[in-house]
Design a protein with these regions (language model features):
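C-terminus-biased signal that marks the final domain/tail of proteins
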Residues: 2-28, 33-38, 42-53, 65, ...
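A residue-level signal for conserved active-site and pocket-lining positions in enzyme catalytic cores
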Residues: 54, 115, 170, 209, ...
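Short coil/turn segments at secondary-structure boundaries
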Residues: 118-123, 153-155, 226, 288
């Protein structure tokens, strides 16, 4: 039986037919899905007085965050967005970049062994063969990742991106701010089976320490909450909430000290960013950037852009990354990125 289209579905179909910018998203543990429609094709860049949906690249020093202006908005419930079981073409993952990625890991290990840094996160993209329905993939992610921020956005001058991220970068009100130090990944079948090794615990500790120090550099007094294991779809992560009174510090300044964290860049942050820029041959673009709703610079709910795909000129790319530390094995690091890619490929294929 054909599922009846919601007003949101109808509005989006009409908007897409005009090739106009739009974004659709749902927050963690929320049944509500929001659609934001922009009525012109212009590229709008966010400032400290903006209201709308913000999308920022990984390297936000070289490009301002993009803003989707809410000229029209629609709401629907996740459960009303239609069938997610419709079969689609199996996603094929290319293995052609293995030697290149292993060579990058070797170079990173040389720098780590020389004590230039402790950890660096290396990312790569995987081009996927075949045609995929982005709206169907978005609905599947909503179904599979109820504890994640799931978003799909499209701009005719930039392309289309889809992500499902468990990692909050920053939530603010006028008086308070909150961030999450998240690291470590486990793919066991239940919470009871999760056993964290020293590597994952140490990596999470680095993230917490970095975010705590960064907030203290602004004169804030962060409160570090207990460490916990959280689930996002088929994966588990170590997470620790950090909160503080905002003390009048503006949104841009808070973001500047929190992004990018060691979880997506490395440790120490400056050395890791320098290595990423020298080693990675492909621009990360919006992968490992951040996105979410902002309201006139006072209130924001932003997430790190992880588990994502992009569409541009009929090319589909999937993005993955992995943290390199002393003792990392290049072959195993390659396999880890392939495993992360397969989790996403199996979901959408």
């Amino acid at each position: 039986m054909e599922v009846k289209k919601t007003p949101l579905d109808i509005a989006l179909e009409d908007h897409r037919s005009k090739d106009l910018p739009w974004v659709c998203f749902s927050l963690p543990h929320q049944n509500e899905v929001k659609l934001v429609l922009q009525s012109t094709q212009e590229l709008i860049y966010a400032d400290d007085q903006s209201t709308g949906f913000l999308v920022a690249p990984f390297d936000n020093a070289s490009q301002k965050p993009l803003l989707f202006r809410p000229d029209a908005q629609w709401d629907a419930r996740r459960s009303l967005l239609g069938d997610v079981t419709k079969p689609i073409q199996q996603m094929a993952l290319s293995k052609s970049a293995r030697k290149d990625h292993e060579a990058l890991v070797e170079q990173a290990l040389q720098a780590i062994n020389a004590q230039a840094l402790t950890k660096v996160v290396l990312a790569r993209s995987i081009e996927c063969e075949g045609a995929y329905d982005p709206w169907l993939l978005f609905r599947r992610m909503l179904h599979t990742y109820p504890a994640a921020m799931v978003a799909i956005w499209s701009h005719p001058k930039v392309g289309m991106w889809l992500c499902a991220t468990p990692e909050r970068l920053l939530r603010t009100s006028k008086q308070l701010m909150e961030t999450v130090a998240l690291a470590g990944t486990s793919s066991v079948s239940s919470l009871e089976e999760v056993v964290w090794g020293e590597k994952e615990i140490q990596e999470q500790r680095w993230v917490t320490q970095d975010l705590d120090n960064s907030l203290r550099s602004l004169g804030l007094s962060p409160v570090i909450h207990p460490l916990e294991t959280i689930q996002a779809g088929p994966l588990f992560h170590l997470a620790q909430t950090i909160s503080a009174e905002r003390d009048g510090i503006d949104l841009d300044k808070l973001i500047s000290v929190l992004h990018p964290s060691p979880a997506i860049a490395g440790w120490p942050r400056a050395a890791a960013l320098k290595m990423i820029r020298s080693l990675e041959t492909e621009d990360r673009a919006f992968y490992a950037g951040y996105l979410g709703w902002i309201d006139s610079g006072n209130q924001a709910d932003l997430y790190v852009t992880l588990r994502c795909l992009s569409w541009k000129n009929d090319r589909v790319k999937l993005y993955v990354g992995g943290g390199i530390v002393a003792g990392s094995n290049p072959a195993l690091e390659w396999e880890e990125t392939q495993a992360k890619a397969r989790v996403l490929a199996q979901l959408i294929g």
